[in-house]
Amino acid sequence: MKYNNILKGKFILRPNRFIAYVEIDGNEEVCHVKNTGRCKELLIPNATVFIQKNDNPKRKTKFSLIGVVKGDRMINMDSQVTNKVVHEWILKGNLLKDVTLIKPEAKYKNSRFDFYVETKHKKIFIEVKGVTLENNGIVKFPDAPTERGVKHLRELIDCIKEGYDAYVIFVIQMKEVVHFEPNVETHKEFGDTLKYAKENGVNIVAVDCLVDEDSINIRDYVDVIL
């Protein structure tokens, strides 16, 4: 996945979930933050950030914050990009073989999953979660309580009971981490439900990514510790 019109900046302040003030070429600019998570460990004053410039006159802001440098790590913060990189990854023959159909935003009962996939022998629902929280190489999800995430896991279990295969894919938006684990300190119910989902047949997958200031692509599988 490739971005265009990327600029380098310096983070100043995030007054709410949706915008941040960033210094770009000596000027203070308002940027849309493409991640509504807390990201407090990433967006600290003077952090180096990467911004995508958008020339669409209908947008309220012409800049979007997509990446940040934490120590020696480049971390992609774009929560909208994870589905795109998973789609590309599956199309290249990863995760599943003999894929005959990939349908994004697939409806299941009264909800939607990120993907519905068919192979020659299986019908599969997939939910994707982006991961940006890292400490000493250990990455965790979520960075804030997520009732929606718990709901998705329970619905994936329902899919299994109805004869589908089911996956939750944690896309770690950085490279070379130690392992992934649920953030039970922040949301114990999510961690418990994730473990229960695995026990009931849901496939739990974590992958890291090669991240540059203007690109992100899935690199390899990462160990999952529940």
UniProtKB/Swiss-Prot annotation:
Q: Which InterPro entries does the UniProt entry name for this protein?
A: SfsA, SfsA_C, SfsA_N
Q: Which Pfam families does the record match to this protein? A: SfsA (PF03749), SfsA_N (PF17746)
GO terms assigned for molecular function:
DNA binding
Record's NCBIfam families?
A: sfsA
Give the protein family: Belongs to the SfsA family.
HAMAP family from the entry? SfsA (MF_00095)
Give the protein's recorded name.
Answer: Sugar fermentation stimulation protein homolog
Name the source organism: Clostridium beijerinckii (strain ATCC 51743 / NCIMB 8052)
What would be the name of the gene that encodes this protein?
sfsA
